[in-house]
Amino acid sequence: MQASPLQTSQPTPPEELHAAAYVFTNDGQQMRSDEVNLVATGHQSKKKHSRKSKRHSSSKRRKSMSSWLDKQEDAAVTHSICEERINNGQPVADNVLSTAPPWPDATIAHNIREERMENGQSRTDKVLSTAPPQLVHMAAAGIPSMSTRDLHSTVTHNIREERMENGQPQPDNVLSTGPTGLINMAATPIPAMSARDLYATVTHNVCEQKMENVQPAPDNVLLTLRPRRINMTDTGISPMSTRDPYATITYNVPEEKMEKGQPQPDNILSTASTGLINVAGAGTPAISTNGLYSTVPHNVCEEKMENDQPQPNNVLSTVQPVIIYLTATGIPGMNTRDQYATITHNVCEERVVNNQPLPSNALSTVLPGLAYLATADMPAMSTRDQHATIIHNLREEKKDNSQPTPDNVLSAVTPELINLAGAGIPPMSTRDQYATVNHHVHEARMENGQRKQDNVLSNVLSGLINMAGASIPAMSSRDLYATITHSVREEKMESGKPQTDKVISNDAPQLGHMAAGGIPSMSTKDLYATVTQNVHEERMENNQPQPSYDLSTVLPGLTYLTVAGIPAMSTRDQYATVTHNVHEEKIKNGQAASDNVFSTVPPAFINMAATGVSSMSTRDQYAAVTHNIREEKINNSQPAPGNILSTAPPWLRHMAAAGISSTITRDLYVTATHSVHEEKMTNGQQAPDNSLSTVPPGCINLSGAGISCRSTRDLYATVIHDIQEEEMENDQTPPDGFLSNSDSPELINMTGHCMPPNALDSFSHDFTSLSKDELLYKPDSNEFAVGTKNYSVSAGDPPVTVMSLVETVPNTPQISPAMAKKINDDIKYQLMKEVRRFGQNYERIFILLEEVQGSMKVKRQFVEFTIKEAARFKKVVLIQQLEKALKEIDSHCHLRKVKHMRKR
C-alpha cells in the first residue's frame, strides 16, 4: 500500500471547509463534501437573516466540525497490511479500504488496519478507532499497535490465526495476540505457538494456505510485498502471511493461474521488478504457495498435472541463466508434487481434510536467511488437526485410513539445517492418524487393543544407551508403518502394482556427514519395501514373485556408515527383510516359493561380525535370523518332535552377560545362519532346483572361531558345513543305498559320537543296529541273537586269525537277496565310520566283515573296499591286517576248489 504524502498533515481548519474534498464514509465509499457550499451560501446572505439565524448558523458550523472529527476517528490505515473483505466467497466491491487519501480525514496508526464484521454485514458504527496521535511515539518506545477483531485475521509479530468449530467460524472466538509486553519473547526462548481447531497454525518461518470446502477462491489473491519493505528483512522481520482462501506470493516468482485445467490469460502475475533482483544476493529465497497453481523456485522446471493428465500449455520455463549458480552455493532443487508441482527449499508438506488431499496447501520450509533463529533457541513447530507436521530432520509420509496418499512424500533435510542439532533442538513432531518417528527406536503397531504378531520391536543399540541418561526418550507410535534408516533407496507400491515414477533417490553424498553428527534420518511408510545397508531382497505376494520389485543393494559409497556405528535395521509388514550375513529361503503354508532365494552377503561384509554389529530383523511370515542361537519350534502349543534345537553353546554365554540377547521366534519357516548348506525336501521328495550352494572355503574357519552353524527347518532336511543329510518320510528309501559324499576331516570333532541320520543308522523293522557284538541268527525264533566275539586288533597285537570271515554259521537259514543287500549296505556304511574312527582298535571292523551276507566273492569285495578306505586315511597297521585276511579268503577259496576237484 502506498502512503499518501498528506498522511501526516494537520487537520483542515473549519474556515477552509468550503474547499472541495473527498472523505470516507463508514461503508468505505467516497463522497464529495458539497455541504460546504451550503455554508458559503449562508455566509453571503447573512445580512438577510436575523440575529437568531446567525446563532443557528454558528451552531451548524460547530456541528459540522464535530461530525468531521467523528469521521476522522472512524478510518484506520496501517503501514504494512492491506486487507479485502469477502462475503459468501464473493468480494464486496464497496468494502475495499483504499489507501490513505491525500486529505486530512484519515488517521494513521502503525501496523494494523481492520474493520469489524457481524453476520457478514459491515457495522458502520463498530469500526475500531486507531491509536490517537499522541501515541505515535509508541513505536519508538517498542510498543506495537495491535487489535483483536471478530471474523477477521489478527496479526502479531509472526502469527495470525483464526479459530473454527464444527467447520463454522465462531465470531466471538478469535484468539487475541500476545500482549505488548511479550515482544522480547524471542530473547527469552519462548516460542510463538498457537492451538487451533481444524486449521493450520504457522510460526516463524512458514507460509501456508487455507482451503474451505476443497474449493479455492480464485479472486482473492493478495498482493505481494512492496519494494519499500525490503529493509524489513535487514531488521530480522520475515515476510509471512496466513490467509483464509488466499494465495501468498513472495519475491522472485513468476507464476500462471489455472482454473479447471485452462490457463486464465489475464491472471498472470508479473515477475519481480528489477529493483528486487538483489534480494537473491541478500540470501532471501523465492517461495510461493498458491491454490491450483504451479510454483517454481530457483533451479526447477516442472509441468502441471491434473487428474493424472498433463496440461500441455502449462509448462513453466526453467530458471534464467543468472540463477544457475545457486546450485554451486549448495541450494538444492527438489520437487514434490500432488498432481501439481510444488517446490520449496527443504520440506514440502500437504494438508488433508476428510481423507482428501488439498493440492494447494503445501507449506514452505524455513528460509535459509532465517537460520539464525535456531541460535536464538526458537524452534519451528506447529500443531495441526488431521494434517501432517514436518520438522527438521525427518522425512515421513502421511497415511489416512490405511491407504497411502501417493504424492505426499516429503524430501529430507538439506545441509544448511544440520547445525540445528548442534544447537540442541531435537526433531519432533506430533500428528493425528500419522506416523511419528524419533531417534533410534521403532515399535509395534496395536489395533483394537490387540497386538499384531509381526510387530516385534528391536532392542536399542548399545551406542544409544546414553540417550536415556540425557533424558531424551526414544519412543514412537505407529499405525501400519515401517521405519527406514540412513542409506535407503525404496520403491513405492500401490495395490500391488509398482509406480514407476515414484522411486525415491538415495540420500545425496553431501549428507553423509549427518551420520558423523549423530543425526539419524528415518521415515515412516506403509506397504513399501524397506532395504538396509547390505541387503538385496525380493518381494512376494500370494506365493508369487513380483519380478519387477527387486531393490538394488546399497551403493558402495555408503559403506562407511557401518564404521560410524550406525546399524542397519528395518521392520516391515508383508515383506522380506534380510540382515548382514544371512542366506535364507522363504516358506509359506508348508510350500516352498522356489524363486525367493536371497543371495548371500558379499565377501566385503564378512568383517562386520568382527566389529560387533549385530544383524537382526523382524518379519511377518518370513524367516528371521540371528547370530548364534537356534531354538525349538512350537506349533499349537505342542513341540514338533523333529525340530528340537540344541541350546546355545557355552561360548555364547558371554553375550548374555554383555546385555545383548539373541533370540528368535519363527512360524513354519526356515532359519539359517552363517555357514549353512541346506537342501529342501517337499513331501519326502527332493526338490532338485532348491539346493543351496555350499559354504565358500573362506568360511571354514568360522568353526574354529567358535561360531556354530546350525539351522532349523520345518518339513525339510538341514545340513551343516560339509555334511550332506537326507530325510526319510513314510519309510521310503533314497535311490542310492548309502550317501556317496563323505564328511571332510575338519568336521570330525563336530559330529563327535552323534548317530547318523535316521534313515541310514538303522536297519529295517526286523533288525537291530550293529554294535560291537556279533549278530547270530536263531533258526527257531527267526531272530538275531547277540553273541560275543572277542577281537582285539591293534598295532602291537600278533597276527589275527580271520578264519571266521570265511566260515559260515552252521544251520543258518537262507536270507532273501533284498534283505542281504540291505544288511550289506548298512555294514558298508558302518565300515566307513569305523575306518575313520580315531585309534588302533580295529576289532569292530572285523566283526562287521564277518556279518557280510553273500558268497566269498562278495566278502572279498568288502575286504578290498575296507583296504581302500584305510588307505585314504593312511592306516598302515589296519591295511596289513586286512591284507592277511584277504590272503585267508583267497586260500580258502583255493582249498574249496581243490576239494571240489577231488570229489569229482
From Swiss-Prot:
Region span, Disordered: 24-72
Presence of the UniProt keyword Ubl conjugation in the record: yes
Compositionally skewed regions (Basic residues) per UniProt: 44-64
A GO CC term attached to the entry: nucleus
Tissue: Expressed mainly in bladder, lung, head and neck carcinomas. Not expressed in normal tissues except for testis.
Entry keywords, A to Z: Isopeptide bond, Nucleus, Phosphoprotein, Ubl conjugation
Full protein name: Sarcoma antigen 1
Cross-link type Glycyl lysine isopeptide (Lys-Gly) (interchain with G-Cter in SUMO2), residue numbers: 778
Subcellular location: Nucleus
Superkingdom of this protein's organism: Eukaryota
GO process annotations (BP): snRNA 3'-end processing
Modified residues (Phosphoserine): 45, 64, 238
